[in-house]
From Swiss-Prot:
The gene is SOT2. It is an enzyme of class 2 (transferase). Its EC number is 2.8.2.-. Its main location: cytoplasm. Sulfotransferase that utilizes 3'-phospho-5'-adenylyl sulfate (PAPS) as sulfonate donor. This is Putative cytosolic sulfotransferase 2. It comes from the Eukaryota. Keywords: Cytoplasm, Transferase. It comes from Arabidopsis thaliana (Mouse-ear cress).
Length: 67
C-alpha cells in the first residue's frame, strides 16, 4: 500500500515540473521535515513560538511521537 501511494504521488505535477499548479516553486512547497524546522520558515514572537510548542505537545500527547 505504501509503495502504491508513493507511485501515485510521484505523478503529481509538482514532482514533474518542480512547481505547483499555482506556480509556487518546489523549494517553497516542500520542507526538509526536520523537527523544529518550522522556526526557520515563520517569523513569530517568543510568545507565539511557546503557544505553538504547547499546542503540539497537547495534541500529540500519548502518541509516541514526542521526546
Amino acid at each position: 500500500m505504501f509503495f502504491a501511494l508513493c507511485v501515485a504521488l510521484s505523478g503529481r505535477e509538482v514532482n514533474k515540473t518542480r512547481r505547483t499548479v499555482n506556480g509556487v516553486d518546489h523549494k517553497d512547497f516542500f520542507r526538509d521535515g526536520k523537527v523544529g524546522d518550522w522556526k526557520n520558515h515563520l517569523s513569530v514572537t517568543l510568545e507565539t513560538e511557546n503557544k505553538i510548542d504547547m499546542t503540539i505537545k497537547e495534541k500529540f500527547q500519548g502518541s509516541g511521537t514526542q521526546d
